[in-house]
Every structure is written in C-alpha cells, then in structure tokens.
Amino acid sequence: MICRNDSGYILRPSLPEDSQNYARLFDQVDPEVARLTGSALHYDCDEVVSFFLANIDDETRRDFLLLDPTSRIIGESVIKEIDSRLRSANFRIAIFDTSSLGCGIGSWAIEQTVDFAFREIGLHRLSLDVYSFNPRAIRAYEKAGFVREGVLRDAVIDSANGNYGNDILMSILESEWREHR
C-alpha cells in the first residue's frame, strides 16, 4: 500500500533503508507524544534500528510510515498481532511531529490503514487501546468507525499530572467497516 493525500502526505510500508531516519525520531521523543502513547522520552538508537528491521520481516505485522510532503518521517501506523485464523489484529498509530497534530493527517492515515486491514489482509476484527486522556485520538478512532468495547480502569498513569487514567478498548468489525465506508 502506498497512499498520497491531496496535501502531499504519504503513507507507505516501512523499508530497511528507513531504519536510521526512523531511529532518529526516538532520540528525543516529544514529552506530549510520549505522554499520549505511553512511550519513553529516549531510546537507544541501535535498539530502535534492530526493532524496526525485525518488524519488517515479521509476518504478524504490517508497519507503515507517514511522511510529510518533503518525505520526512512524521509518524507510523501499525497493524500488529495479526491472527490469520481469527482474522483479527491490533492497531496503533503515532504522529511524532507535534506540528502535524490536529490537521487531519492522523485521521487520514487511520482510514487508509483500516481500509488496508480489511481489504488486503482480510481481517474480521481490528482492535486498539487508547488512553482516556487522549481525546483527539479517541475522536479520530470514532470517526473511523471504531466502537468502544471496554475500559481498563486506572490502568495507566498520566505523566502530565501523575493521576491514573483509563485504557479504553475499541474495535471495528468488518461489517462495521463496510457500513462506514
């Protein structure tokens, strides 16, 4: 899958030659991005490269990179834990470039990835979890047709204030995706 939107953003599969540029994203993670995704603020470059390259060959995942119009990596969209027998998988997305937040880029990437999951992989169910203190992501997932199906209460800590937050479980079924399109 290679998709380009009207603004020139591209969503495409991760390639081995992307590993170093991808690793640079994790040299110093924006505190707000780390807060909303549960990430650390810093990762070892070699470990990120190894992880990235291993994921490319992993048959239970499909990793996509989100590039801005200058071809700079600004995020990723991942279908993981693909279970071919159950036709189910887990989904996650992260926009690392905070200047790209709130512009609809994430919603577009979610839509493209969800379409790929059902159309190309042939999934029956795609699930995700999102922190209760990430309302922008919750709205984007609901806009894409995901339905809330459960809550893990006080399962995470909001690094902004030290308070507990909920981990919201969401999913979309193939029939819901077809109706939503």
What is each PLM-predicted segment?
Residues M1-V49, S175-R181:
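A short, well-structured alpha-helix characteristic of acyl/acetyltransferase catalytic modules
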Residues L41-S99, L173-S175:
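Acetyl-CoA-dependent GNAT
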Residues S100, G104-T113:
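Conserved acetyl-CoA pyrophosphate-binding loop and the N-cap/start of the following alpha-helix
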Residues R119-D129:
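Conserved GNAT acetyl-CoA-binding A-motif
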Residues S127-V130, V147-N163:
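Conserved catalytic-core motifs of GNAT/GCN5-like acyltransferases
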